[in-house]
């Protein structure tokens, strides 16, 4: 493979659809590889725009906007970083010869909970929670009765964790349904009603596909990451997981099956729920995963580098754990503060093995993820203790 110089003829170029913290890390890895980076998002000054060669502020639900930028830039790889993308535009672009990573149909399937559940439970026959689909209040009531209380209502499409509503009794169903769809992407009123299970722990199995030297596509999994989401969104993760080897092998088998069926190139973040003796498929992201931020500290090759390498046709034959590690988010507690400031960074960094990554988001809202603390240790328990302490010290003002 030949890689040219950025901003010159013959450069290799990636186009990021979404410029959040995951996109920023991909952009940094791409810059290190000598690639040209173009970043898109719906708002200006998004994190990946800080480290891109060019940026565009567009509505990515508008197919004409996406196609216009792609036609102008003609990237070697189009990488979807967020959920709010017009996937029909990606399918059209792919049919016209552009490489969409991992592939356009996978992006479309993974961003729709209903289609994803059909794919996993009905096509692949993977173990999942009990579920039903509904698109109005009466159907939701019937679904909740069939599934049993307590149960969860989730929008067909939403960003991670948003719109997940726990329902304990029939009297609360209508309000819960309205709350859930208020977080939906687009105009869909469809939801998935799921059995509520006691979660002992959750795993993310990072599974990636790349071109080998023989041009065949190889699928590999990384040692599972463990995490817990107290309010349906990522707070902390640690690597490696503490679950048994048998649970890890089952989880990796599920993830491998999902990635091979979805196909394409790049990394998938496959989410697994462990509930008693049940090991259940939950969701899959067609990109680096937020819980995988821990690989910036734990692994010799992090998830972002893997994804970019695969996107442009480079191999990643092996990923090694170099240290037990943990990550913990830094959340904003303020609303609508532009140009926020971070206090006590020096105190957090006094803890040995701690790194602080600030994402550079231009404005806060309550519980917005503004940064992450990473730490290594002799064990994941030691690393977790460090990141919890360090993240509690840092204030967003």
UniProtKB/Swiss-Prot annotation:
Pfam families: ATP-grasp, PurT_C, RS_preATP-grasp-like
Binding site for N(1)-(5-phospho-beta-D-ribosyl)glycinamide: 21-22, 81, 290, 361, 368-369
Gene Ontology biological process: 'de novo' IMP biosynthetic process
Keyword Magnesium belongs to the record: yes
Record pathway: Purine metabolism; IMP biosynthesis via de novo pathway; N(2)-formyl-N(1)-(5-phospho-D-ribosyl)glycinamide from N(1)-(5-phospho-D-ribosyl)glycinamide (formate route): step 1/1
Gene Ontology MF terms: ATP binding; magnesium ion binding; phosphoribosylglycinamide formyltransferase 2 activity; phosphoribosylglycinamide formyltransferase activity
Record EC number: 6.3.1.21
Residue positions binding Mg(2+): 271, 283
Residues in ATP-grasp domain copies: 118-312
Catalytic activity as recorded in UniProt: N(1)-(5-phospho-beta-D-ribosyl)glycinamide + formate + ATP = N(2)-formyl-N(1)-(5-phospho-beta-D-ribosyl)glycinamide + ADP + phosphate + H(+)
Binding site for ATP: 113, 154, 194-197, 202
A single cellular component GO annotation: cytosol
UniProt keywords, alphabetically: ATP-binding, Ligase, Magnesium, Metal-binding, Nucleotide-binding, Purine biosynthesis
Quaternary structure, from the entry: Homodimer.
Functional note: Involved in the de novo purine biosynthesis. Catalyzes the transfer of formate to 5-phospho-ribosyl-glycinamide (GAR), producing 5-phospho-ribosyl-N-formylglycinamide (FGAR). Formate is provided by PurU via hydrolysis of 10-formyl-tetrahydrofolate.
The family this protein is said to belong to: Belongs to the PurK/PurT family.
PANTHER family in alphabetical order: FORMATE-DEPENDENT PHOSPHORIBOSYLGLYCINAMIDE FORMYLTRANSFERASE (PTHR43055:SF1)
Protein name in the entry: Formate-dependent phosphoribosylglycinamide formyltransferase
Organism of provenance: Saccharolobus solfataricus (strain ATCC 35092 / DSM 1617 / JCM 11322 / P2)
Taxonomy of the source species: Archaea, Thermoproteota, Thermoprotei, Sulfolobales, Sulfolobaceae
